Amino acid sequence: MIHNTVLEAVGNTPIIRLRNMTGPEDAEILVKYEGLNVGGSIKTRTALNMIDDAEKRGLINENTVIVEPTSGNQGIGLALVGAVRGYKVKIIMPDSVSEERRKLVRHYGAEVILVHDNGNIGLCIEECVALALRMRDEDKNVFVPQQFENPANPEIQRQSTGREILSQVNKPIHGFCSGIGTGGTITGIGEVLKAANPDITIWAVEPENAAILSGGSIGTHVQMGIGDGVIPEILNQEIYEDVCIIKDEEALDTAKLLASKEGIMCGISSGTNVAAAIKLAKKLGKGKTVVTVLPDTAERYFSTPLFED
């Protein structure tokens, strides 16, 4: 098959069974490896669907400047889509995100605008959003997809990722867990999996230093892409029954083990998700199946503690 653009290759990522990270009495863990997606993360799906939706609704045209506040992967995804579709893109990011994220956005031809993270990621994200909305108010050509409240975000997880998981696993799924960034992944996939098995156990996952769903304090953490210190508008808070809190050290150690024990190169938030999945697998026990998502690839974390000896 010949694709007319790289965007036609988005999705259909593999499901992989973890063979070396669970005990004999634990449930099996299956991971949806989005690091192999076009653009290296699950967010390419979201970026493409938000732009497709905006085009269909006549919200953008050849003069549009796409501006989005993000802690990383969504910006990379939008920069990629903009490169293919011919849109000018500006990405507003906390200055605490990895250097690789910034470079990837620029590599796709987009502009990076940094906002200082003064130790509270929630306030920083709010400042990023406020700046994007000011830019929109000052320029009629600016379009802000607003991933935290755009229904096209969870919808693509329902229509693509969730359905892919059901088809690939092709047996009952007893547990699912996902870190909370925009809330699109856990909402979209969670709703699909719960429709297939109403008895499924679903956990939301948060960094210890940004556990807003659990009523914790908001600081800065290394689990980039989740734990933005806000409760997203699109998050279905009825879809999960519990919240699992993961320390930075757990996330980093688990991501490193995924590489050294399973040969899977993935980012820090993938370590977060798998650390939670291991806890859920122990709770559900042998004979059950737990699914989680590996949101991105490791190569955008060389400058972070993930690659420290």
Regions found by a protein language model. Give the residues of each.
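PLP-dependent amino-acid enzyme catalytic core
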Residues: 1-309
